[in-house]
From Swiss-Prot:
Residues binding Fe cation, per UniProt: 54, 58, 128
Record carries keyword Iron: yes
UniProt KW keywords: Autoinducer synthesis, Iron, Lyase, Metal-binding, Quorum sensing
Family the UniProt entry places it in: Belongs to the LuxS family.
Assembly notes: Homodimer.
Matching InterPro entries: LuxS_sf (IPR037005), Metalloenz_LuxS/M16 (IPR011249), S-ribosylhomocysteinase (IPR003815)
Protein's name in the database: S-ribosylhomocysteine lyase
Catalytic activity entry: S-(5-deoxy-D-ribos-5-yl)-L-homocysteine = (S)-4,5-dihydroxypentane-2,3-dione + L-homocysteine
Lineage: Bacteria, Pseudomonadati, Campylobacterota, Epsilonproteobacteria, Campylobacterales
Cofactor detail note: Binds 1 Fe cation per subunit.
Cofactor or coenzyme needed: Fe cation
Length: 166
């Protein structure tokens, strides 16, 4: 089995919160697809709470589109990582990490302005696979933590995995 790009970085020295350029690829027609690692937590030290992560998924996807989509950039998907330390964001275009960080921080502010659980989009049994697995309080705690720490840059070369360690 091939070693995927996400496992070629040393998670023991990865800082968070931070934006990491995970991959850039071209479609057959030449469009650029960019994947960002939006690392909320320091791997193996912190973990996002399950209910808060699910709520964040519902809110973050829309708010990031509000702040980042433009004529040159369109978000395809934002999905939580299985390890619960962040999200992957795939998009058409190549925004700078600074643009991504600014949109992320603005999205966290938006999450803090959500008034009640009733305001979470698609929170019903028809549009959500586990509609009882949500916590606005946890999502807002995550947002407060990100804003308190600030979003930085994660340099792939600085955290390149020394393959002799595995």
């Amino acid at each position: 089995m091939p070693l995927l790009d996400s496992f070629k970085v040393d998670h023991t020295i990865m800082n968070a919160p931070g934006v990491r350029l995970a991959k850039v690829m071209n479609t057959p027609k030449g469009d650029k697809i960019t994947v960002f690692d939006l690392r909320f937590c320091k791997p193996n030290i912190e973990i996002l709470p399950q209910k808060g992560t699910h709520t964040l998924e519902h809110l973050f996807a829309g708010f990031m589109r509000d702040h980042l989509n433009n004529n040159d950039v369109e978000i395809i998907d934002i999905s939580p990582m299985g390890c619960r330390t962040g999200f992957y964001m795939s998009l058409i275009g190549t925004p700078s990490w600074e643009m991504v960080a600014k949109a992320w921080e603005e999205s966290m502010k938006d999450i803090l302005n959500v008034k009640s659980q009733d305001d979470i989009p698609e929170l019903n049994k028809y549009q959500c696979g586990t509609c009882t697995l949500h916590s606005l309080d946890e999502a807002q705690d995550i947002a407060r933590n990100i804003l308190a720490k600030g979003v930085g840059y994660i340099d792939n070369e600085a955290i390149k995995l020394d393959m002799s360690k595995i």
